[in-house]
């Protein structure tokens, strides 16, 4: 009996190993079929499965203010033909979406070179092949856009209705020899945009132009690539993902030509159709760091100045129904959550009150200090020093509680005030931000000691209250049981990734503990956000994978970092070089309870197989930016 049992176990293990080997060798397949174009003013989404532009919007942000959403000005733009494209892709990793047909290409873009609120479609081919081609579209104020099945604003119900009055036009022009370009233009008027001649003027300009606008747009983005630092050691796939990430970062930043002056420079957490096309401080801070690392200094500076100028400070005091004041209690400049499209601070509400997130202070401090350190922009530092001291760094210090941790807030996962906690992530990023700011203050011969001391206080508070068994860190000070929802928290790894704690032995023991409970099953590493039956929390989070990879690099574990980083690269390579919020995991999906399955209409994360792109796509700060920061660290000498 014992021999039979042993043989059965060995056979089972062999079969599992064989299956795992087969799965490991299985090539990745595309799982995301939408592409986005934006010029920081307008944004449009191409649906490759349906061969159409789902919709085009007059702004890249979700809400003007607390009471008004942004609606599309046109929907379902389709080529008036039964022919389907052979291939769809971003043209040379730019913002131009190209659909290749047998005898012509169709190119979709918002124009950076023109900087206008016109959506352009350019058919390119021989005259006889394109002269009779045209498009049909859903237009008209109040008309519902058909075919949209997922929310594009988590507070906005379906269906989505068109707003504004459509303006259209077309023109044919010779490109070279017998090749022509046929331009189709879509714009609008509304209460904020009243230029009824915008399309006719653009058509006249196209007709007279000596260059192709399509070529001008591609050249614009390629020039941006050349302005960035892209190490020659990158693989071809890595270079493609980095270039596309540069385009995404550029597309996600509001243009200086946006009609709302306080919105200039704000960076979306995602592009449409991803749900999070809102300027979060957290995501924006990582995006700014990535811009700085790339050499996109002008864009990084604009991102910082947007937050330094934005109207804010509205939650200095916030008394919740439990009678506690969750505000910082002092004047502050950086939003406690995110920003409306008009540039004002927004702390989004639900039945449990607003989100109030003090980690934003620390993350902004880090992004600010990183920019100044890498650019040596002393004039910028001096210009904003008073605001940075009094309304950012001092505001952070004021949030340190009596136990040497940042006071309770909504946390990095935004649970509002339902269960406020003192989070490891929050204290960790605030400690690191103050630490870096103190060093810069000292470098500029300015007062620094209180920031240095505050950083040391927070670090000691983390070691005292968050370190368990001298081996690993829990997610917050409040939860005592390992079964608690946020006891184990993927955000914990930020204290290693940002360089606050550089104890390799402690990192490895923390890794060992979290591998038991937060790592997905299978041959490759991958990590969930929280132990949960909610699919938005229990799937594999790309941002967490990348921050763990960054922590591995700081600990000298380059091979372990590569396992996480390479999978992101390989996935992006088959999905137009974009990066999602999450990857699906079937075993984790089986843990999702029925009451959470309806969440799919907003979270886009219910799938029946592994390794699918899910959640918000494309992610900017938590996607493209986090990838760039990790990849560049990997190739650092």
Model regions: which residues?
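Bacterial Sec-dependent N-terminal signal peptides
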Residues: 1-22
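Terminal accessory carbohydrate-recognition/targeting modules of carbohydrate-active enzymes
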Residues: 19-241, 276-278, 283, 292-299, ...
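Solvent-exposed loop and edge beta-strand segments that line ligand/cofactor-binding
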Residues: 46-48, 210-220, 224, 230-234, ...
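Helix-terminus loop motifs that line ligand-binding clefts
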Residues: 91-93, 259-270, 295-375, 379-400, ...
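Well-ordered alpha-helical scaffold segments within catalytic/enzyme domains
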Residues: 225-234, 247-251, 285-298, 363-380, ...
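Aromatic-lined, polymer-binding surfaces characteristic
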Residues: 277-278, 332-338, 356-361, 368, ...
């Amino acid at each position: 009996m014992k021999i039979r049992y042993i043989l059965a176990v060995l056979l089972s293990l062999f079969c599992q190993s064989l299956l795992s080997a087969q799965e490991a060798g299985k090539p990745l397949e595309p799982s995301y079929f939408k592409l986005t174009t934006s010029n920081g003013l307008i944004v449009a989404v191409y649906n490759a499965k349906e061969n159409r532009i789902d919709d085009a919007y007059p702004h890249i942000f979700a809400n003007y203010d607390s009471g008004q959403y942004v609606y599309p000005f046109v929907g379902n733009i389709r080529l008036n033909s039964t022919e389907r494209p052979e291939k769809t892709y971003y043209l040379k990793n730019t913002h131009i979406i190209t659909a290749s047909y047998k005898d012509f290409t169709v190119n979709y873009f918002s124009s950076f070179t023109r900087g206008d609120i016109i959506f352009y479609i350019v058919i390119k081919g021989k005259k006889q092949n394109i002269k009779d081609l045209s498009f049909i579209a859903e237009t008209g104020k109040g008309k519902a856009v058909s075919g949209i099945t997922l929310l594009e604003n988590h507070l906005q119900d379906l269906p989505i209705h068109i707003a504004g009055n459509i303006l259209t036009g077309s023109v044919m022009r010779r490109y070279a020899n017998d090749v022509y370009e046929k331009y189709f233009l879509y714009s609008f008027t509304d209460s904020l945009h009243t230029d009824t001649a915008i399309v006719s003027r653009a058509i006249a300009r196209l007709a007279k132009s000596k260059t192709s606008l399509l070529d001008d747009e591609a050249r614009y983005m390629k020039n941006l690539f050349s302005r960035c630092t892209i190490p020659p050691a990158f693989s071809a796939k890595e270079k493609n993902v980095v270039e596309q990430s540069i385009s995404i970062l550029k597309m996600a930043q509001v243009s200086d030509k946006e009609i709302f002056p306080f919105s200039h420079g704000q960076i979306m957490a995602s592009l449409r159709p991803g749900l999070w096309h809102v300027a979060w401080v957290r995501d924006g801070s990582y995006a700014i760091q990535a811009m700085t690392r790339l050499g996109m200094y002008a864009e990084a500076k604009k991102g910082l100045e947007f937050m330094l100028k934005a109207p804010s400070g509205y939650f200095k005091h916030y008394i919740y129904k439990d009678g506690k004041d969750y505000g910082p209690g002092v004047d502050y400049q950086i939003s406690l959550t995110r920003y409306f499209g008009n540039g004002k601070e927004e702390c989004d509400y639900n039945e449990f009150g607003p989100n109030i997130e003090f980690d934003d202070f620390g993350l902004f401090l880090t992004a600010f200090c990183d920019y100044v350190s890498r650019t040596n922009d002393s004039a910028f530092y001096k210009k904003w020093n008073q605001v940075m001291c009094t309304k950012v760094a001092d505001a952070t210090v004021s949030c340190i509680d009596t136990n040497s941790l940042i006071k309770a807030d909504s946390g990095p996962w935004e649970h509002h005030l339902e269960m406020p906690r003192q989070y490891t992530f929050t204290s960790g990023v605030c400690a690191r931000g103050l630490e870096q700011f103190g060093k810069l203050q000292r470098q500029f011969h300015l007062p620094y000691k209180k920031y240095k001391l505050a950083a040391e206080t927070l670090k000691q508070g983390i070691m005292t209250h968050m370190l368990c068994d001298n081996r690993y860190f829990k997610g917050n000070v409040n939860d005592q049981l390992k079964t608690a929802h946020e006891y184990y928290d993927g955000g914990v790894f930020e204290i290693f990734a940002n360089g606050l704690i550089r104890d390799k032995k402690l990192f490895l023991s923390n890794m060992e503990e979290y591998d038991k409970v937060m790592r997905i099953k299978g041959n490759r590493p991958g990590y969930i956000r929280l132990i949960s039956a909610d699919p938005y929390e229990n799937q594999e989070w790309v941002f967490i994978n990348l921050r763990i990879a960054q922590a591995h690099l700081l600990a000298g574990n380059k091979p372990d970092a590569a396992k996480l980083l390479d999978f992101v690269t390989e996935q992006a390579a088959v999905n137009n070089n974009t990066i999602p919020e999450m990857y699906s995991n079937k075993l984790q999906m089986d843990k999702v309870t029925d009451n959470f399955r309806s969440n799919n209409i907003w979270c886009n994360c219910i799938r029946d197989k592994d390794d699918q792109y899910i959640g918000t796509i494309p992610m900017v700060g938590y996607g493209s930016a986090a990838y760039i920061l990790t990849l560049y660290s990997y190739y650092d000498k």
